[in-house]
Curated annotation (Swiss-Prot):
InterPro entries cross-referenced by the UniProt entry: Ub_conjugating_enzyme (IPR050113), UBQ-conjugat_E2_core (IPR000608), UBQ-conjugating_AS (IPR023313), UBQ-conjugating_enzyme/RWD (IPR016135)
Reaction(s) catalysed (UniProt annotation): S-ubiquitinyl-[E1 ubiquitin-activating enzyme]-L-cysteine + [E2 ubiquitin-conjugating enzyme]-L-cysteine = [E1 ubiquitin-activating enzyme]-L-cysteine + S-ubiquitinyl-[E2 ubiquitin-conjugating enzyme]-L-cysteine
Keyword Cytoplasm: no
Residues where N-acetylmethionine is found: M1
Tissue: Widely expressed, mainly in skeletal muscle.
Keyword flag Cytoplasm: no
The family this protein is said to belong to: Belongs to the ubiquitin-conjugating enzyme family.
PANTHER family: UBIQUITIN-CONJUGATING ENZYME E2
UniProt name for this protein: Ubiquitin-conjugating enzyme E2 G1
């Protein structure tokens, strides 16, 4: 896949998302001159602790996309087992294709070139609704989610939701 083909694919995916928006998120370019850096706004899924939140994140695509996955980083603070303290998202769909050297993931759970921005975002929204506590990026959040989901974990998420609402459109 050439860089030109990659750029055309990203342009097509962005146009499709603008033409046919998907419930739960919106996407656009950070800089109109750079197809490889996107900003997404994710609406906290209904009936979850994240409901009502408006979380900003960045997707950074490699020049050989879709052969390799983008990186995703929350810009808005979020307390979640699968998001590290720097905001980096850790879910299977964003892991490099192939075998997992640690044996936690099957190859088909990892990045495949058939994935799109839409499938990535649906996976992230699903992750918000149902964290994977077995392979956390934020061990402290995972421990609280397992041991005190309706206590300290819920309080920290509620604080992040409030903060996201206050800063969503800055």
């Amino acid at each position: 896949m050439t860089e030109l083909q990659s750029a055309l694919l990203l342009r097509r995916q962005l146009a499709e998302l603008n033409k046919n928006p998907v419930e739960g998120f919106s996407a656009g370019l950070i800089d109109d001159n750079d197809l490889y850096r996107w900003e997404v706004l994710i609406i906290g899924p209904p009936d979850t602790l994240y409901e009502g939140g408006v979380f900003k994140a960045h997707l950074t695509f490699p020049k050989d996309y879709p052969l390799r996955p983008p990186k995703m980083k929350f810009i808005t603070e979020i307390w979640h087992p699968n998001v590290d303290k720097n905001g980096d998202v850790c879910i299977s769909i964003l892991h490099e294709p192939g075998e997992d050297k640690y044996g936690y993931e099957k190859p088909e759970e990892r990045w495949l070139p058939i994935h799109t921005v839409e499938t990535i975002m649906i996976s992230v929204i699903s992750m918000l609704a149902d964290p994977n506590g077995d392979s956390p990026a934020n061990v402290d959040a995972a421990k609280e989610w397992r041991e005190d989901r309706n206590g300290e974990f819920k309080r920290k998420v509620a604080r992040c939701v409030r903060k996201s609402q206050e800063t969503a459109f800055e």
